[in-house]
């Protein structure tokens, strides 16, 4: 018998960690926010320029799972947020968390056949091309029942992780997609670029000055995005994962290291990559304890291969709407 768990996740627990993203993700940028400065843990200054993108005109494929369907709601957790607490194995968050009070009615964002697992507060609805999973929901439909668009599926229950419905979307290949991608769920407006909180350089686990690199160096940056709508307490002002993080290294017009993508959240990342993407010190959000999202920008960067003089390390973070933050830090050996 097919179950909701089989359709939503192959790992039967609430915290589990490729669709083609609409070409409008790479939009022209405008309305630059004044550059900000920061300091790494050992004092090397960096600058960041935050830029707001033009508004998207991509039509969403489906509306929200709570009423009103055509109005944006607060989202308190994003796809690929780190999950590493309470004894759970490290994993990527496999959907988004739409904040809503306990007892809120949850509705189907697309038609299909419902799959319900006895004793589990979740419903999956499999359609012609995509399967949608709704977690932390007490089902109001039967197993294998055909459901219509906007049909009542159940009601939000608080299973100890706060008041929300976790929405997951999978394609026919079983890949989890980002519901907040352009052409996914909508309406969704975001005018808040990500933040680069810190940039650290470590040699043998110890911090070194960006202007005196030696040996093999790991570069770690704490980067986070903010939610466009305020999430109700106690989950207000928590960080979320940027959609894309890239880095490059150059000197003048010469590209020393070509641009490399660290994370791309158009789909959920394989769990085996967790320790290659998130550096030690990364924590997920908890009530009263906002998380820290520490990304490996580079690992084992050979200082001896840097050219003489000062080079420029660039870290580029964007969200699903093209809002962008570009951080720059001078480095040398």
Feature map (PLM): residue ranges:
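Bacterial N-terminal signal peptides
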Residues: 18-34
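Short alpha-helix capping/helix-loop boundary micro-motifs
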Residues: 99-100, 138-141
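N-terminal secretory signal peptides that target proteins for export/translocation
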Residues: 1-12
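A short macromolecule-binding patch
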Residues: 130-138
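Glycine-rich acetyl-CoA-binding "A-motif" of GNAT/NAT acetyltransferases
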Residues: 152
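Long, low-complexity serine/threonine/glycine- and acidic-rich segments characteristic of extracellular
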Residues: 189, 195, 204-333
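Surface-exposed, glycine-biased beta-strand/turn segments
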Residues: 35, 43-123, 128, 148-149, ...
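Short nucleic-acid-contacting surface segments enriched for D/E, G, S/T with interspersed K/R
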Residues: 141-148
């Amino acid at each position: 018998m097919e179950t909701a768990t089989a359709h939503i996740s192959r790992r039967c627990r609430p915290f589990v960690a490729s669709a083609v993203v609409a070409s409008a993700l790479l939009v022209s940028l405008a309305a630059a926010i004044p550059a900000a400065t920061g300091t790494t843990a050992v004092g090397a200054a960096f600058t960041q320029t935050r830029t707001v993108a033009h508004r998207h005109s991509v039509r969403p494929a489906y509306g929200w799972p709570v009423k009103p369907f055509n109005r944006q709601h607060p989202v308190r957790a994003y796809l690929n947020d780190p999950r590493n607490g309470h004894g759970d194995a490290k994993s990527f968050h496999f959907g988004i968390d739409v904040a809503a009070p306990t007892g809120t009615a949850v509705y189907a964002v697309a038609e299909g056949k419902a799959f319900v697992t006895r004793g589990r507060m979740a419903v999956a609805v499999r359609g012609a091309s995509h399967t949608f999973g709704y977690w932390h929901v007490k089902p109001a439909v039967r197993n294998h029942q055909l459901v219509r668009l906007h049909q009542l599926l159940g009601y939000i229950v608080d299973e100890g992780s706060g008041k929300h419905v976790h929405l997951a979307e999978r394609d026919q290949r079983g890949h989890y997609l980002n519901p907040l991608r352009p052409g996914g769920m909508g309406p969704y407006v975001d005018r808040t670029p990500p933040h680069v909180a810190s940039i650290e350089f470590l040699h043998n686990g110890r911090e070194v000055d960006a202007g005196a690199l030696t040996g093999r160096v790991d570069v770690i940056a704490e980067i986070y995005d903010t939610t466009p709508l305020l999430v109700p307490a106690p989950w207000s002002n928590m960080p979320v994962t940027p959609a894309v993080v890239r880095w490059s290294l150059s000197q003048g017009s010469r590209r020393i290291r070509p641009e490399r993508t660290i994370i791309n959240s158009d789909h959920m990342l394989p769990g085996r990559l967790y320790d290659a993407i998130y550096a030690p010190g990364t924590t997920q959000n908890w009530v009263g304890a906002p998380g820290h999202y520490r990304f490996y920008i580079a690992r084992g960067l050979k200082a001896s291969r840097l050219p003489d003089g000062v080079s420029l390390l660039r870290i580029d973070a964007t969200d699903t709407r093209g809002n962008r933050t570009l951080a720059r830090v001078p480095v040398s050996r």
